[in-house]
């Protein structure tokens, strides 16, 4: 109570922070008359003037006021929009590296122009991050008009660009793109062989739109680049055939944690069933050599118990397509990881696509922490403010609205059963539709949106198909005539193609729109209709001229009239029902259930009441909803029973809302803990990733890596001597035979080690010096024979390729370690500390293996004389087919797409001309492999992709023919 009194007197910390920006807002406003008087050329010249001030020692903060004033005037001239004072405050928050929380319709896109322009003046690049390609392209085109007017360049990073186009976009002053594209470009850059091929030029400043969606909802989802592995589709089908025979007592299912495991009885049943099916040929299921079978059983079990068709995924065109739980969109190209997607494909009897092996990965948490300065924008961040502060060191500032929010958020209506809840929703839709009030109904899944659609059809409503050319005509005719159409639209993954039209017209009088979660849609619902959409749809055939202008004026007038109707569509007071006040018109949001996160509910509510418009929102719940059933209090059901509610009757009370909010807070806290835990483990890999990537980039930047190669050779000899000649041991105790064998194997040297050991007074240091001298002499002769230029090229490529190969193997090993490390807790040992310790040992092993393998390969390189190319390839050896994935370590969800290597993009792979050393790829030769001529392949590793181009491993293709 004292806190609330103090808050009223002194204001909140947020109020005080916002107040602190007001003096600079006043300074910007004071500059406005002076800047308004400038010509376009003079306004554009201010960019060069501000750059000069930076070059002369001023900081970005020093020039913030004139820079913001310049952008404001440019935006006004380019598309007639002037930044409000609160938008200037939002821009300052972003410039300082904070999160600006701005309500729907408050112009976040326009706000970003202020800090983007200011920071772009440094010439180090500014990245604006959006959630999809459409928004990246739209915002770059729209806001790019302002930047180009002021003399800055703008680029866009979207799917399908080749490396040259990406490099050009990153070289611009300002770059728009999606979070996935930025992350994958970073990973791809760290798989290339020349600095000249790198697309990105550093991580200076990023502004993340919908920051809560990207840095919170997707924080656990690593970006993964992977390559194909062996086809095991028959095994997936065979294991899947066993799942329908499992009874419920054979497994433990935890919906809250989304986990499932076989009971002891279930293990016995599966073992016996697999023996009968010929899948378990020897030993027990959990024997080490059967670990792959265990993995397949677990994934098949998850597919059948944790994942539901039309809720978590749909089947379309012989594919299992994931549904995003936050937006309800189809995630074309996304795939679940670790064989789960293949298990779902087996379950649904569709074509099973091959699995992939991780080649490089990074989480969004660690990618975005690469930036020197990071900022974000969203309409809903306050509920996650603690997480932003702890993980990203970002403060959330609630920016005041330009106009007060007029939306009325009503208390939830809670029913006993789902059926009663839906009946209540249909009744409310009937009432609102009769008043011509536009309604947006939010559902949690495709399944639920289609269930509600079926109920509406039974109630006499029909589905509005926006693929029909006359659909919009009918919508507007009904609005003009004041007719009740009893028609509705469905916005979910199945109707993705119609999304823009459905959202644009959701504010027309009498519109009924059923939508899965609206998070990240990026399109405002405007009351009365969307002018731009109508012009595009209705006037696309008209050229510019008086006729088109007249038609546009008519559409504007009709939208204004429709807006007036929508504003007047509120529900009058009903004293008999205990409601003394009128309820407002505007867009009516009806939520069919609460989401696990309050933030998602707030995003749905925020679709109504934009820019001071009136609006209304209400959630309809039942005790059978997932949130209430899994996380809600058992006492709530008892309480409703005691109240003696009749069939179809609901309870409405603020206490119910508080109880639900507590359930949501429990879930949010659990999810936060999971994300923090993921980050702790990923930080271990991230530290190693930074070392490897920095070292790799250092190698790429050197003209010659001879010094590194020499140091590696010397280190290998030190290790060999230490391994076979114990300290202070007599010569008779030395492992001379082992030393000679290893010297031959690694250094390719045939030296009389036994004779040296018999010499009087010989010591380990003398042995080391002789081996080093012999190795250096042999390598110098090889270099002279091959030529210095060729040797330098081969050294660099061997070093980079070997590092890549070992790093990929290391990633797989760390992943396996992480999956089993949790069991250490049963031995009273901290799994995280155990993981750190073992990961460190594994990394040391990687460094040792790198020295030995590079030394061994370079000691055997021979040149095979063929027709020489015009010049040495800049790109190094060709890379195998690769895919980009977006993996969730908890749910297993993946985004997967071609990673930019292949047609249209060299991806750093370079031409087919390359080198090969024994033990790596071929017989130690610089040669060109012809896929049709096996004589040009040299020696191929059994696990390498077959040079014929089949995509299979060599041992399963041409290698099997030679075996």
UniProtKB/Swiss-Prot annotation:
GO molecular function list: ATP binding; metal ion binding; protein-exporting ATPase activity
Residues reported to bind Zn(2+): 946, 948, 957-958
Cofactor note: May bind 1 zinc ion per subunit.
Gene Ontology biological-process annotations: intracellular protein transmembrane transport; protein import; protein targeting; protein transport by the Sec complex
Gene3D superfamilies cross-referenced by the UniProt entry: 3.10.450.50, Helical scaffold and wing domains of SecA (1.10.3060.10), P-loop containing nucleotide triphosphate hydrolases (3.40.50.300), SecA, preprotein cross-linking domain (3.90.1440.10)
Coiled coil: none
Keyword field: ATP-binding, Cell inner membrane, Cell membrane, Cytoplasm, Membrane, Metal-binding, Nucleotide-binding, Protein transport, Translocase, Translocation, Transport, Zinc
InterPro entries noted in UniProt: Helicase_ATP-bd, P-loop_NTPase, SEC_C_motif, SecA, SecA_CS, SecA_DEAD, SecA_motor_DEAD, SecA_preprotein_X-link_dom
Entry's EC annotation: 7.4.2.8
Catalytic activity: ATP + H2O + cellular proteinSide 1 = ADP + phosphate + cellular proteinSide 2
Subunit structure of this chain's protein: Monomer and homodimer. Part of the essential Sec protein translocation apparatus which comprises SecA, SecYEG and auxiliary proteins SecDF-YajC and YidC.
Family membership noted in the UniProt record: Belongs to the SecA family.
Function: Part of the Sec protein translocase complex. Interacts with the SecYEG preprotein conducting channel. Has a central role in coupling the hydrolysis of ATP to the transfer of proteins into and across the cell membrane, serving both as a receptor for the preprotein-SecB complex and as an ATP-driven molecular motor driving the stepwise translocation of polypeptide chains across the membrane.
UniProt protein name: Protein translocase subunit SecA
């Amino acid at each position: 109570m004292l806190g609330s009194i103090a808050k009223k007197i002194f204001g909140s910390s947020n109020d005080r922070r916002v107040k602190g920006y007001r003096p600079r807002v006043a300074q910007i406003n004071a500059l406005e008359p002076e800047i308004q008087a400038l010509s376009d050329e003079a306004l554009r010249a201010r960019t060069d003037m501000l750059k000069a001030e930076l070059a002369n020692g001023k900081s970005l903060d020093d020039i913030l006021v004139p820079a913001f004033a310049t952008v404001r005037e440019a935006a006004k001239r380019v598309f007639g929009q002037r930044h409000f004072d609160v938008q200037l405050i939002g821009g300052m928050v972003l410039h300082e590296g904070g999160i600006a929380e701005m309500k729907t319709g408050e112009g976040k896109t326009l706000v970003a122009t202020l800090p983007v322009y200011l920071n772009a003046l440094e010439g180090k690049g500014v990245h604006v991050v959006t959630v999809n390609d459409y928004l990246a392209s739209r915002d770059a085109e729209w806001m790019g008009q302002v930047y180009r007017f002021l003399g800055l360049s703008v680029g866009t990073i979207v799917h399908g660009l080749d490396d040259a186009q990406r490099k050009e976009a990153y070289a611009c002053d300002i770059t728009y793109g999606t979070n996935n594209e930025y992350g994958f470009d970073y990973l791809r850059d760290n798989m290339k062989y020349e600095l000249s091929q790198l697309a990105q030029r550093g991580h200076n400043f990023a502004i993340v739109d919908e920051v809560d969606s990207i840095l919170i909802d997707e924080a656990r989802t690593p970006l993964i680049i992977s390559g194909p592995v062996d086809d095991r589709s028959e095994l997936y089908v065979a294991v899947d055939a066993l799942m329908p025979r499992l009874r419920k007592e054979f497994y433990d299912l935890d919906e809250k944690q989304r986990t499932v495991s076989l009971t002891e009885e279930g293990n016995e049943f599966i073992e016996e069933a697999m023996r009968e099916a010929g899948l378990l040929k020897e030993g027990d299921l959990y024997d080490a050599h059967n670990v792959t079978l265990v993995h397949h059983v677990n994934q098949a079990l998850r597919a059948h118990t944790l994942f539901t068709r039309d809720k978590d995924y749909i089947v379309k065109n012989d594919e299992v397509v994931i549904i995003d739980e936050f937006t309800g969109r189809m995630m074309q190209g996304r795939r679940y990881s670790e064989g789960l997607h293949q298990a779902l494909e087996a379950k649904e009897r569709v074509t099973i696509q091959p699995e992939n092996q991780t080649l490089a990965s990074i989480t969004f948490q660690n990618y975005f922490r690469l930036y020197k300065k990071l900022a974000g924008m969203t309409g809903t961040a306050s509920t996650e403010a603690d997480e932003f502060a702890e993980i990203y060191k970002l403060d959330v500032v609630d920016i005041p609205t330009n106009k007060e929010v007029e939306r009325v958020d009503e208390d939830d209506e809670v029913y006993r059963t789902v059926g009663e809840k839906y009946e209540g929703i249909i009744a409310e839709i009937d009432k609102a539709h009769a008043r011509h009030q536009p309604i947006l109904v939010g559902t949690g899944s495709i399944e639920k949106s289609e269930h509600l659609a079926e109920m509406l059809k039974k109630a006499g409503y029909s589905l509005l198909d926006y693929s029909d050319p006359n659909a919009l005509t009918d919508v507007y005719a009904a609005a003009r005539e004041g007719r009740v159409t009893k028609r509705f639209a469905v916005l979910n993954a199945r109707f993705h193609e119609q999304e823009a039209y459905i959202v644009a017209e959701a504010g027309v009088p009498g519109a009924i729109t059923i939508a899965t979660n609206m998070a990240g849609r990026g399109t405002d619902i405007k009351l009365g209709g969307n002018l731009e959409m109508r012009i595009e749809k209705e006037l696309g055939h008209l050229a510019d001229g008086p006729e088109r202008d007249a038609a546009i004026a008519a559409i504007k007038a009709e939208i204004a009239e429709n807006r007036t109707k929508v504003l007047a569509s509120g529900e009058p007071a009903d004293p008999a029902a205990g409601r003394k006040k009128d309820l407002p018109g505007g867009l009516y949001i009806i939520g069919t259930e609460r989401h696990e996160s309050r933030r998602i509910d707030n995003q749905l509510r925020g679709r109504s009441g934009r820019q001071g418009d009136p609006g209304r929102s209400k959630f309809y719940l039942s005790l059978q909803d997932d949130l209430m059933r899994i996380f809600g209090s058992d006492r709530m059901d008892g309480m409703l029973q005691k109240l003696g509610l009749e069939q179809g009757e609901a309870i409405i009370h603020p206490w119910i809302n508080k109880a639900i909010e507590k359930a949501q807070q429990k879930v949010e806290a659990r999810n936060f803990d999971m994300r923090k835990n993921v980050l702790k483990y990923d930080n271990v890999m991230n530290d190693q990733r930074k070392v490897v990537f920095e070292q790799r980039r250092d190698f790429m930047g050197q003209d010659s890596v001879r010094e590194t190669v020499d140091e590696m050779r010397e280190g290998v000899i030190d290790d060999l001597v230490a391994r076979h000649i114990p300290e202070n041991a007599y010569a008779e105790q030395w492992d001379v035979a082992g030393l000679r064998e290893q010297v031959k194997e690694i250094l390719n040297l045939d030296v009389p080690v036994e004779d040296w050991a018999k010499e009087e007074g010989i010591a380990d240091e003398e042995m080391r010096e002789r081996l080093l001298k012999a190795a250096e002499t042999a390598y110098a002769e090889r270099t002279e024979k091959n030529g210095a230029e060729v040797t330098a090229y081969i050294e660099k490529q061997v070093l980079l390729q070997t590092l890549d190969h070992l790093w990929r193997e290391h990633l797989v090993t760390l992943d396996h370690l992480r999956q089993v490390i949790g069991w250490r807790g049963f031995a009273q040992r901290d799994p995280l500390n155990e993981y750190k310790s073992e990961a460190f040992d594994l990394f040391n092993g990687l460094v040792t293996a790198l020295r030995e393998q590079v030394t061994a390969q370079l000691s055997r390189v021979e040149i095979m004389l063929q027709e020489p190319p015009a010049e040495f390839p800049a790109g190094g050896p060709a890379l195998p087919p690769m895919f980009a994935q977006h993996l969730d370590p908890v749910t297993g969800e993946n985004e997967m797409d071609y990673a930019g290597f292949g047609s249209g993009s060299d991806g750093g792979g370079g031409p087919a001309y390359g080198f090969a050393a024994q033990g790596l790829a071929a017989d130690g030769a610089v040669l060109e492999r012809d896929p049709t001529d096996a004589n040009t392949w040299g020696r191929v590793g059994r696990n390498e992709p077959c040079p014929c181009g089949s995509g299979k491993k060599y041992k399963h293709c041409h290698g099997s023919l030679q075996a």
